[in-house]
Amino acid sequence: MPRPTKFRRVEFFPENNYFVPWGKPKCEIHEVVLKVEELEAMRLKDIEELNQEQCAEKMEISRQTFQNIIDSARKKVAIALTEGKAIKISGGHYTTKLCKLKCIDCEEIYEINYEQDRHLCPNCGSEKVICNKKADFCRRWCKGQNRKEQYEESKNK
């Protein structure tokens, strides 16, 4: 049985997460899904110009895992560009220091490990969780986890 996938640390999220070839009819568009950590690997290596070891440290993974991630990312982008496919940035196994959730029941504050614990508190298992920050990042990526009404409701009980 293989080991569970370790979550990769991600610091950047694009404002746009879908890119389509210009002038191609919608019915003819096929897409390539680029994981969030694959985009982060390309950003660190190709834009920030960090070496492989620095990139791996920032993402909190091994150098070999980093190399596998960036190879996969570059292959997907090359396929999309050469075959006229759309690029959708979505999914993956990642975590971030940018956003934390707070459990209303036990008041635990924790980092989000996407997709794993977006809706459940890891401490008590409650579904009553809200964003702990009101950052622009949260509005785009937490997808409605900042539920003020739910928080106010729980205080009134």
Curated annotation (Swiss-Prot):
Signal peptide positions on this chain: none
Superkingdom per UniProt: Bacteria
Database matches in Pfam families: DUF134
SUPFAM superfamilies: Sigma3 and sigma4 domains of RNA polymerase sigma factors
Membrane-spanning ranges: none
PANTHER family reported in the protein's UniProt record: PTHR37478, UPF0251 PROTEIN TK0562 (PTHR37478:SF2)
Protein family: Belongs to the UPF0251 family.
Name this polypeptide is given: UPF0251 protein CBO1373/CLC_1408
